[in-house]
Amino acid sequence: MLHGMNQQKQFFQINIILLFFSFFLLLIIFPVGGKIDMYLIQPWIDSTGHFFNRDNWYLERLNHEIVKQIITGIYVIFLGLWLASFKVEKLKLYRWQYGYMFFVSMVGSALVGLLKSQSAHACPWNMVHPTALSYVWDFTAKHGHCFPGGHASAGFILMTGYFVYRLEQPKRAYFYLISGILLGFMMGWAQMMRGAHFLSHNLWTGWVIWAVNILFYTVCIHRFEFEKRIKQ
């Protein structure tokens, strides 16, 4: 028991330190529209200031729509399982996991959406203006509400599964963690190739989702420990 408590305490200490460290790292090393953002966005703009991948089928239809629809389907299943657990006895034991996975993920996604709706940061494709010879960046552009990256959140919210299963099924937990990181990054990168976001937009999305999960997990850790005990 004491060993388990020490492990949980260490887990939270490490994650709080990482959250604070990464917060300042993003502010200092990855400022929105900073050198790294500009360096990584340049390859996707032609000489006239046009993002040539903006209407690319694979990036727009496959990444922006189909992949998101698949992830949405996964969460519809979790919601369905949670609802079914009130009627189906064999699902009752997993009700907490199903509900936590769905509702905490939705809170994380909704928070990103709320921050984005209130943001003054424009999308890269709204910041580029053609000139007679080339193009210029307008960093005063305010329309767009593009920070943080909303699309990437659909991938990053899968990281919630890491917290759901870390005590009972570590392999499944790491599957969700790795899948969430990879999907969030890839979905965000594809949007960057289209000119919809800077890299920093998506990195902040990942940070917000992780912070939300740490907050909820801190509050709910005792319930997860209880769920583990009753299944043993």
Predicted regions and their residues:
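Membrane-interfacial, low-structure loops and terminal tails that flank and connect transmembrane helices
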Residues: 2-12, 90-91, 227-232
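Alpha-helical transmembrane spans of integral membrane proteins, capturing the lipid-embedded, hydrophobic core
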Residues: 20-24, 69, 73-74, 101-110, ...
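Membrane-interface loops
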Residues: 92-170
